[in-house]
């Protein structure tokens, strides 16, 4: 299903959380933590279920390079809630770690 719903939330002037999801079932989603550096938005962390509705990936990034995911299984709503909550609670630490791996 195409992701036809997008919600953006600025966590700081240079950090945003973007949630994209499909309206129809099975729900496909991507939840992305973005950071503005040197005039460009870069991805720091991605959560998605691109391969299967019940297979959830968490991708960290080193620079621009996506790392192998941590994979979990379960209901879409639970995974989306957990991903968004993790980013809302821990975004400062996640961004700090990403900046020190550049």
Language-model segment annotations:
Residues 4-5, 17, 56-59, 85:
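Intrinsic disorder/low-complexity segments enriched in polar/small residues
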Residues 20, 29, 41, 57, ...:
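Generic marker of "main functional regions" within proteins
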Residues 28-68:
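A short, structured beta-strand/loop element
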Residues 64-102:
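Acidic, low-complexity intrinsically disordered segments
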Residues 12, 30, 50, 60, ...:
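A sequence-composition feature that detects small, non-aromatic residues
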């Amino acid at each position: 299903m195409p992701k036809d719903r997008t919600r953006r939330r600025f966590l700081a002037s240079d950090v945003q959380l973007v949630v994209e999801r499909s309206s129809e079932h099975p729900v496909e989603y991507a939840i992305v933590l973005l950071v503005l550096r040197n005039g460009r938005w870069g991805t720091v962390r991605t959560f998605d279920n691109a391969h299967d509705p019940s297979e959830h990936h968490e991708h960290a990034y080193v620079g621009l390079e996506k790392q192998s995911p941590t994979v979990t299984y379960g209901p879409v709503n639970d995974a989306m809630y957990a991903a968004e909550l993790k980013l809302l609670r821990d975004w400062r630490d996640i961004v700090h770690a990403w900046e020190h791996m550049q």
